[in-house]
Amino acid sequence: MKEFYISIETVGNNIVERYIDENGKERTREVEYLPTMFRHCKEESKYKDIYGKNCAPQKFPSMKDARDWMKRMEDIGLEALGMNDFKLAYISDTYGSEIVYDRKFVRVANCDIEVTGDKFPDPMKAEYEIDAITHYDSIDDRFYVFDLLNSMYGSVSKWDAKLAAKLDCEGGDEVPQEILDRVIYMPFDNERDMLMEYINLWEQKRPAIFTGWNIEGFDVPYIMNRVKMILGERSMKRFSPIGRVKSKLIQNMYGSKEIYSIDGVSILDYLDLYKKFAFTNLPSFSLESVAQHETKKGKLPYDGPINKLRETNHQRYISYNIIDVESVQAIDKIRGFIDLVLSMSYYAKMPFSGVMSPIKTWDAIIFNSLKGEHKVIPQQGSHVKQSFPGAFVFEPKPIARRYIMSFDLTSLYPSIIRQVNISPETIRGQFKVHPIHEYIAGTAPKPSDEYSCSPNGWMYDKHQEGIIPKEIAKVFFQRKDWKKKMFAEEMNAEAIKKIIMKGAGSCSTKPEVERYVKFSDDFLNELSNYTESVLNSLIEECEKAATLANTNQLNRKILINSLYGALGNIHFRYYDLRNATAITIFGQVGIQWIARKINEYLNKVCGTNDEDFIAAGDTDSVYVCVDKVIEKVGLDRFKEQNDLVEFMNQFGKKKMEPMIDVAYRELCDYMNNREHLMHMDREAISCPPLGSKGVGGFWKAKKRYALNVYDMEDKRFAEPHLKIMGMETQQSSTPKAVQEALEESIRRILQEGEESVQEYYKNFEKEYRQLDYKVIAEVKTANDIAKYDDKGWPGFKCPFHIRGVLTYRRAVSGLGVAPILDGNKVMVLPLREGNPFGDKCIAWPSGTELPKEIRSDVLSWIDHSTLFQKSFVKPLAGMCESAGMDYEEKASLDFLFG
C-alpha cells in the first residue's frame, strides 16, 4: 500500500500533514515547504505557459518569501505564474500523478449532541449544559455515548441498553440490537468530567473527517464554545492536532452565525453534503424528514418538547441521540457522499473540504494535469463581473400530446467545449458575425475554413487540444462509466420485476450477483426459480447499487457542467467571457438547428407542409410529437402495448437518430469544428395505454409537463413511469397528501381519461377533511421575520406564512419550545374567522407536531375549504385545462335536444 494524506495544513512556513503510511498507520509529519513559482523569460525553457511562452522556475526558501515575491511582481505589473495555493502544490509535489487510497483507514466521526434549556440553545452563547453526546467512529465501528446524569435540570438514572432493545409497548425504544451491540456507554456525574473525557476520545481517535447533521451550524460551535467556557481555551484547542481552532462570524440572508474550523480535521456537515449532492427537493431538510425519505425510517418519536424529554423520559432521550447519529450513517450507506468526497478529493489532489467548490476542484485538476506536461498555470486575474447569454428554451403550446419521443444531447456544454476546442489558449481571433437566425437556417456564410468556430464570432485552433477540453473529457468518461453501471442495475431491477409478474419459483437461497453488470438471459431464466421474497431482496440490492452509481454519475455531470459555469465566473483562474459566450451561443444554435432539421424530415415522412412537430424543448433536448406518424401507419396494426412502444423505439433508432446525426455533422462542418461530438440519442417514449382514453402527455408551460413513459433510454418499464416536471407535485411547498393526490390525478389524465379523473376528484374531496393536519399543511421558508414583526403582530404587507409564524410565536410564548428562525422551513395552515389565535393562519417548524398545548385548538379551527381550493383544486384545474378535460362533471343541456 502507498502512503496517502488525510489532512494538509500550513503552519508558518511549514506544511503539517496527517497521512496513512504503507502499513495503514496514521502518521504526522511537519515539512519545511520550499515552493516553486514561475516568471516569463526570453531564454528557451522546458517550462511553458498555456500560451506556449517560456517560463523560468523561481524556487523560494519559504512560503513567506514566495508570497512576498508575488506581491512585488504584482506591484511592478508582471505576472507571477504557478500554483499559489501551497497546500495543493505540496500534495502535487509529494504524491505525483495518482493517489491510491484505502477508505477503511480514513477515520470518519459522526456526532450529535443534546442540550436541555429553558429556551432553544444558542451555540454562540452555549449557556446550557451539554447533557448527551453520541460519537460514531468509522474505524472502530462503535457508538461512544457520553451521558450527563446530574445537571441543573435534575438527576437521571443510567440508560439501559436492554430496555432500549424492547418494543415501545413494553416501555422500550425499539433500538435494533445490531446498533446496541456497538454502543459504548459512559455515564458522568458532572459536565466537566464528561467534556474532558470527550476530548480524550478525540485525541486517541482523532477523525480525519468530522460529520453529522447541521454540525457546522450547531454541534461544533456549541461544543467549542461550551468547552472554552467550562475548561478554557487551551482545552478547546486540543480538538486540533496542531492546536489551532478558529472561528469567524459570517453574515447570510438570515443574519449572523459563528462558524468554527478545527485545523487538521475536515468538518463536512452532512446537511450541506446532502443539499449539494443529492439533487432532491424536500419540504424539509430536517434529519427526520431526510431519513424518512432515504431510509424509510424516521427519528425516535417522543411526547412533548425536546427540552422536557430528558426529565420525563431519559431512557428515550439517550436512545433518540444514538438513533440520530445512526440515521446519518444510514443515509450515507445509501447515498455514499463521504466516499464521493474522498474519491473527488484524491482525484483532484486537494483537501477534502475543497470539493464543495467546483472552482477550487477544477483549479486543482487542471494544475496537476498541466504540471505533468511542464506547463505553467496563469496567475489568478482580477475581473469585473459581466452577464452573458443563457440557453434557449422552446415555448410549448399548453395542450395534450399523445405520442411523444424525446431526444437528448449527451452532456451538451462539455461536448461543445470539446467539439469547438474552447480554451483560453486556443482562441485565434474573430470573424464577422451574422444574426443568429441565419446560422440556425444555415444561410450565413461559413465562418472559416482554417479555424473551429462558434456563432458568437470567436475562432479556435483546430489542431492542438485545449487544456479545458482535455480535462473535461477525462471526467466525462468517468461519468459515462458510472452511468453505464447505474443503467445496468436499473435494467436488472426491471427485469426481476417482470419475472415476479410472471410468477416466482420455490428456491429460497439467494444467488451470488456481480454488481454493475447487466444480467445475462441465462441468469434471468435461472432467477425464475427463486421465491418472490428472494427476488424482492435482489431488487432492493439493485436499486441501492443504482442509487450509489447515480450519485457518482450525477455529481460528475455537475462537475463537468460546472466547468462551463466557471469559465464565466470572475473568480476562476481561466475566466474568459468570450469562451462562456461561445458555449451558450453554440448551444442556442445547436438545439434550434436540430428542431429545423427534424421538422423538415417529418414533414417529408408524413406528407405535410410546415407542420411543427416540436412539442417542446430546452437547453439540450427536444420533445417530438409523432401523432402524425402513428396516424400514417395506423393504430390498429398494434395488438399489444409493447408493439406500439417497440415501433416508436425502432422509428427513433433506425430513422430519427441517423437523421439527427447527419444533421449535426453538417453543423460541425459548417462551423469547421475540431470533431463531431453533438450526439443526440432517443430518451423517452411516451404514449397512452392502447385502447384507453388517457392523453399520454401534456404541457402547461416551459419546463412544466407530464408524460406517460414506457421506455427511457432503452430501459423498458414493467409498468409505465410518470415523468412529471415543474408541476406542483415537484414543489416542496405542496402538502404531502396533495402531492400524492395530484400525482394520482396526473396518472389518470395520462392513462385513463376524464371520467377517471372526475371520479378520483369526488373521492378525494370527501377524504380530505379526515387527513392528518401535517400532510395537508403547506410548506414555506420563513425569511425576514423581524422585518414584518410589529410587536408580535403582522406589519405592513406581511406575507401569509410569516403571519403564521407570528401567530405561532404568540401562541407558544412561555412553553419553552424551539423558536422559528429566519431560513427555517415551516408548515402553514389557514384558520377560520373567529379563531382564538387572532389571525388568519398559523405556522410551525416543518416536520414536527404542533405543541400539544395548542394542538386541539388549531385542529378545530382549520379552514379546510380554503386550503383545499388553493393547494389542490387550483393546480388540478390548470392541468386538466391543458389536457383538454374537466376535473368535475359539468351539467349539460344536451338532454333538451334529444
UniProtKB/Swiss-Prot annotation:
One biological process GO term for this chain? DNA-templated DNA replication
Record site feature (Optimization of metal coordination by the polymerase active site), residues: 618, 703
Cofactors (names): Mg(2+)
Region Binding of DNA in B-conformation, residue ranges: 702-705
Per the UniProt entry, the Enzyme Commission number(s) are 2.7.7.7, 3.1.11.-
Q: What is known of its domains?
A: The N-terminus contains the 3'-5' exonuclease activity. The C-terminus contains the polymerase activity and is involved in binding to the polymerase clamp protein. A beta hairpin structure is necessary for the proofreading function of the polymerase.
Region annotated Interaction with the polymerase clamp sits at 893-898
Q: Which Pfam families match?
A: DNA_pol_B, DNA_pol_B_exo1
What this protein catalyses is: DNA(n) + a 2'-deoxyribonucleoside 5'-triphosphate = DNA(n+1) + diphosphate
The identity of this protein, by name, is DNA-directed DNA polymerase
- Assembly and binders: Interacts with the polymerase clamp; this interaction constitutes the polymerase holoenzyme. Interacts with the helicase assembly factor. Part of the replicase complex that includes the DNA polymerase, the polymerase clamp, the clamp loader complex, the single-stranded DNA binding protein, the primase, the helicase and the helicase assembly factor.
The listed outcome for residue 114 to A is:
Almost complete loss of exonuclease activity. Decreased replication fidelity
Q: Where is this region: Polymerase?
A: 377-898
Q: Which sites bind substrate?
A: 411-413, 479, 557
